[in-house]
């Protein structure tokens, strides 16, 4: 099928394939990084952590009330100032920057 395409189109398709594979690798690394940060936060705080605001390095763990239970989220420097979307903040635990850096790939 590809043999009927022009060399330019074949080259473009190869580039797209490489970019797609690179993007998949980045997404996979981002997932791994999040899991590493969740584990670090759980070890440091003793809380089960399974939410993070984005792919940026977290600076704190914000614990908030949802009805009768508590939940938590890792927040980065950008989102820490936008905590208005979290209602009923119960506690904020700062994370040591050196610790976060040591758990960053």
Report each predicted region and the residues it spans.
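Acidic/histidine-enriched, beta-strand-rich ligand/metal-binding domains
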Residues: 2-105
């Amino acid at each position: 099928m590809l043999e009927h395409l022009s060399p330019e189109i074949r080259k473009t398709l190869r580039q797209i394939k490489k970019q797609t594979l690179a993007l998949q690798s980045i997404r996979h690394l981002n997932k791994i990084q999040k899991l590493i940060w969740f584990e670090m936060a759980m070890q440091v705080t003793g809380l089960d952590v399974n939410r993070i605001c984005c792919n940026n390095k977290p600076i704190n763990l914000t614990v908030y009330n949802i009805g009768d239970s508590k939940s938590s989220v890792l927040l980065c420097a950008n989102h820490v100032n936008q905590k208005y979307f979290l209602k009923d903040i119960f506690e904020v635990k700062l994370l040591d920057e050196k610790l976060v850096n040591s758990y960053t790939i």
